[in-house]
Design a protein with these regions (language model features):
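A short, hydrophobic, proline-anchored segment that marks a local hinge/packing element in signaling
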Residues: 118-125
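Residues within the DNA-recognition helix of helix-turn-helix
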Residues: 208-211
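Basic, Lys/Arg-enriched C-terminal extension of HTH/homeodomain DNA-binding domains
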Residues: 214-234
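Regulatory input/activation interfaces that engage signals or partners
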Residues: 5-6, 18-118
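Short beta-strand-to-loop transition segments that serve as allosteric relay/switch motifs
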Residues: 109, 131-140
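Glycine-rich acetyl-CoA-binding "A-motif" of GNAT/NAT acetyltransferases
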Residues: 128
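Juxtadomain coupling helices with adjacent low-complexity linkers
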Residues: 1-5, 12-13, 136-175, 183
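Helix-turn-helix DNA-binding segment
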Residues: 163, 167-204
Length: 234
């Protein structure tokens, strides 16, 4: 079975290395594996990178931290859409078609000898994500072959999640009243309207909103609503 050695490997690094070795005869030239937790903040190139969890990256000398590397990782990273959509199997070219718009993107990847890349991603509890990016130096993989490699990749990413991740950091704890009051702020309600809906005095409604804002580390109510959304509390 393709990638079978990875399943018996004792560590995430060993599993990733074994998987890459098994795919090199198929033309694999690049690998990156990660196991991390999805950022609580809005998903951007920076927050995605800061989530860490890098296990193995094999690339040509000098490409990592090059201008080309920074471009595909930070300046123009279309693969964030795959995470937003919860995609498990895809190619880089599914999100970055080979057209004029993404010309510079593919030029940057070519410096790492990546003609295209196959991806497999597993999603676990508490925002756990394990991902595989496997680059190939030419476009010779047919659809059936690519699909078989992606299925094997999912076995690897499930194995990586199985090794375990650090506990998720605990988010702000809002009381049910604080959460409800701020949710009504998100709907554009005034303190008086919130008080009427919740059966409270106006000053008590304001108290709950202000408490929620402070717990979320927000500078004003609009900021608090944004934090409520990014913390997935709404």
């Amino acid at each position: 079975m393709l990638g079978q050695d990875a399943l018996a490997a004792p560590t995430p690094v060993a599993a990733s290395e074994a998987f890459f070795r098994s795919l090199q005869p198929f033309g694999a030239t690049y690998i990156q594996t990660r196991a991390y937790r999805r950022p609580r903040a809005r998903l951007t190139s920076d927050s995605h990178w800061s989530a860490g969890g890098f296990i193995l990256r094999y690339a040509p000398d000098g490409w990592v931290d090059s201008v080309a590397f920074d471009y595909v990782c930070f300046e123009n990273n279309p693969l964030l859409d795959a995470i937003r959509l919860g995609q498990t199997c895809y190619r880089f070219s599914d999100f970055a078609p080979r057209n004029r718009r993404f010309g510079r993107y593919w030029e940057a990847l070519a410096e790492a000898r990546i003609h295209d890349a196959l991806c497999a991603t597993s999603y676990g509890a508490a925002g756990a994500i394990a991902s595989l990016h496997l680059g190939f130096g030419d476009g010779g993989l047919g659809p059936d072959e690519a699909r078989a490699i992606q299925m094997a990749g999912l076995l690897l990413t499930e194995r990586l999640i199985g090794f375990g991740l650090p506990d998720a950091p605990e988010g702000p704890r809002l009381t049910p009243r604080e959460r409800d009051a701020l949710a009504f702020v998100a709907e554009g309600k005034t303190d008086w309207e919130i008080a009427t809906i919740l059966g409270l005095s106006e000053s008590t409604a304001r108290f709950h909103v202000d408490n929620a804002r402070r717990k979320l580390g927000a500078v004003n109510r609009s900021h608090a609503v944004a934090r409520l959304i990014t913390e997935r509390l709404l």
